[in-house]
Amino acid sequence: MSNYSNAKEKFDVIVVGGGHAGCEAAIATAKLGLSTALFTLNLDRIAWQPCNPAVGGPAKSQLVHEVDALGGVIGRLADSTALQKRILNASRGPAVWALRAQTDKRQYSIEMLQMLQETPNLSLREAMVTDLEIKSSPNRKKIKEQSEEKTIGQVQGIKTYFGSIYLAKAVILTTGTFLKGKIWIGNQSMDAGRAGEQAATGLTEALQKLGFETSRLKTGTPPRVDRRTIDLGSLEEQKSDAADRFFSFDPERWKSGQQMSCYMTRTTQKTHQLIKNNLHLTPIYGGFINSKGPRYCPSIEDKIVRFSDKESHQIFLEPEGRNTPEIYIQGLSTGLPEGMQLQLLRTLPGLKNCVMLRPAYAVEYDYLPATQLLASLETKKIEGLFSAGQLNGTTGYEEAAAQGLVAGLNAARYVNNQDAIIFPREESYIGTMIDDLIKKDLREPYRVLTSRSEYRLILRGDNADRRLTPLGYKVGLVNDYQWNIFQIKQSNMEKEKKRLEQQRIKDSDPIALKIEKESGASIKGSITLANLLRRPGMHMNNLIRHKLANNSLPLDVREGVEIDIKYSGYLKRQNLQIEQIKKQNKRALPSEVNYTNIKTLSQEAREKLNATQPKTFGEASQLPGVSKADLSALLIWLKIQNRKSHAAKIRNNEAKIKLHSNLGVDF
């Protein structure tokens, strides 16, 4: 090992990349008292939003609430820079309610940079990291995590393009789309991590030399148009409907600026025909690139090819900031040549005279398949090396921020020689996402979805603090101020729920007749306010209107109380399921099992189980390649083995009794 006498500086943790994952990771480690350096290619593009300047949406908003509950910052910045807020899926149940904020991308970046600069223990450096410094012999074993791969080394630091070495006890890679990034417009390409910014070189080769598998993914972004050249009056306006809703649980941050409208237009037959006639000129259909793009954010070419029966597709026009005329054309990501993109835009109603400020482009980049990571987001091969964000194959600022926080927390615990914190999938969307990433061989950008969780009624945004803030406080990410806010809210909720469960109204009360008309059901004798609230169509607002509920309670308290009461039966059943899973996770597995003989297991599961010989069912469930079907088969096998063992004991006892009886021995 080199003595590193020429090292420029030494830190506890180095974070490589200044996007949403990197910022959360760096703030987390610094907050936990570790000297931290964040390296990025461009300090003027910290936490940049190169695609849609928006935060939240289905499942994504739940992630943002969870990050905030753990002391992260994405929710606070989304609230303070929001241009417009809307509640999605409002007509459906609370499990899928989603807050979405259109944000001011420049202001977001400015505020994040300021936050980083004001964070104690955190230093910022502008440089391209091209290599990793590795000690060949690992220092210690992985803590409380199962891995069939042996570590081959321990991270010591990083090396920059111009040869400077910086030492660190842990390194977190959050490189986004920059590793060997290449942007495409039509059949033309250039090396870039995103438009106007250079690609990162060297680090992919460094990872490959260490034995890591890397592959390629792609994403894309639509054109930007000058607002002043759009006929907004002819378009459908979408106003904010949730200015009083927030991602953060801190009431001191519940402030909204003046809201801006978005607008909606649609593709036309001219749009579709132009695309069909020129598919061969796009990077994908022209065969210039073959990397997988995000399934849930397809290009307009993909939409028209895959949904050829649809006559039109919605296109949303969204502002990029208060002080810029740039409009983001959501739904029109395209790989068409630049000269053809303006023609495409002008086929849309309201945009026939528009001016295009920035063309759409696709970006292709290297990523690290996350099956090479532990649930702590530490790599299996190299101790102290963590990976988070788009580098792990995800797409979205929210997914990146959540991973960054987890990687930062566990990097700090690694440095302090503490056990890693693992987020079970049944307790958070963070856990669901990481569980999916490390266990599934994903070959397309991963987006979090409510449908990916079996426990979505419990994993709501409104109760993210209840689920995660105690953990955040315990590990040091949540400060005393945030903890006090949490305790006050929970106390208010419990008091109000208790009151509603106890207070009754009688059928003879004057208010009863009005309530019967509202709820469509009669009151016989008397009813508690809680049972009244459980009736379809009855809400806290109904109780407030009749002065039966406390209107002075904050909105989040009132909504949380209503959800807890209204869905108490469902919540109880789902909590019971989770407890059963936890109980099963502690169940011991026999030692030295030949899993090859269990034919109901998949071939991959047999190989992984044989290689690791997990001690508990919970350890088996954490292994990549062991599916839910395999786990069910393993449980059935365990039950059969227990029955056989029990039957064998009975036969053995009967044989002993018979033997002693023949010998004339009394018991």
UniProtKB/Swiss-Prot annotation:
Recorded GO CC terms: cytoplasm
Names of required cofactors: FAD
MF terms (GO), sorted A to Z: flavin adenine dinucleotide binding
Compartments where found: Cytoplasm
Residues reported to bind NAD(+): 293-307
One Pfam entry name: SAM_GIDA_C
Subunit (UniProt): Homodimer. Heterotetramer of two MnmE and two MnmG subunits.
Family: Belongs to the MnmG family.
Role: NAD-binding protein involved in the addition of a carboxymethylaminomethyl (cmnm) group at the wobble position (U34) of certain tRNAs, forming tRNA-cmnm(5)s(2)U34.
Matching HAMAP family: MnmG_GidA (MF_00129)
Protein name: tRNA uridine 5-carboxymethylaminomethyl modification enzyme MnmG
Organism for this UniProt entry: Prochlorococcus marinus (strain SARG / CCMP1375 / SS120)
Gene name as annotated: mnmG
